[in-house]
Amino acid sequence: MRRGDIVNTLNPASYSAVDSLTMIFDVGVSGQLTNFKEGKGRVNARNAAFEYAVGSFRLLPNVGMTVGILPFTSVGYNYSKTTFLDHTNGSLTETYAGEGGLRQVFLGAGWRVLKPLSVGVNVGYLWGDIDRSVTTSSTTYINSLARQYAFSVSSYKLDFGVQWQQKVDRHNVLTLGATVGIGHKLGSDPVCQIVNVSNADTTKFQISNGLSLPMTYAVGASWNHRDKLLVEADFSLQQWGKLDFPDISSAGGYVMQSGLLKDLYQVKAGVDYVPLPMGRNLLTRVHYRFGLGYATPYYNINGISGPKEFSMSAGFGIPISRSMLNVGAQWVHASAKDMITENTFRINLGLTFNEGWFAKWKIE
């Protein structure tokens, strides 16, 4: 997507489209409810989060710049499963918990090299902590065993983008884009502790430089008709399958292993419709939006692919002078055979300020 009144952080080449007389601020928050289902058991989890804040402006002729903070990944769950073994061994309870996340601050620039061609780059700093644990307890045994995983990240993130925009005729514009994200070692030393809760006996493992980012590739296209109808679609690939990941081995150690991760493929499509962009009636100037998405899992569980993800979203953008209030709802369904099924309902609120800060006033 390439528009002068919207910040598209997915492709830094789009920053060159920002108008020379405006400054764009975009902030967003979200709230969500997730339902976890396994067999007859159901658990609900609620949370809210500050999503992003970005600002974009014209730096030089044909050069736009963007700065901001974005989420990279978020973890938050606490789930227990109890299995009845038999009358001798009683019941076994497994509790899975996780918290934390990674965020990135970035500085990006887009340069319009030729009238149809733009290139860009995002340079970011990625940081955060993630903790996970699996605790096993039994009704017939005193000992409880916990496996605790933790890692911290403090590294860089680098993405490149290119866009080609072509006016097909008087009323239609085609935009093609592509991005590449650079994969690299994160310099993080993941830790695993195996704790016997009853006698406080702890075995600690640590792997030096054990986490990496994958190479990522994406291509997309959008069609703009009379500035009323915008249709867009994109495809992305994350090459997790080429990376090893730390895990407990069959021998009991914490080592790097292959085959735990797999390549992630994602397809998304969306529509943005405005009845009358210059109409006097507010309802005719509202942006009505709808989108669909599908993603394959990037990990295996006991040799079986994780849950596939299907998403659907709808929302609208309400113009307020030169700015825009964005309201959206999203449903995300993730499921796989013999695994937990997740249904997430999310509300997104965003406000885009588009202010004419750099206009020169003339007094006669």
Stretch-by-stretch model annotation:
Residues 1, 58-364:
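Outer-membrane beta-barrel porins/channels
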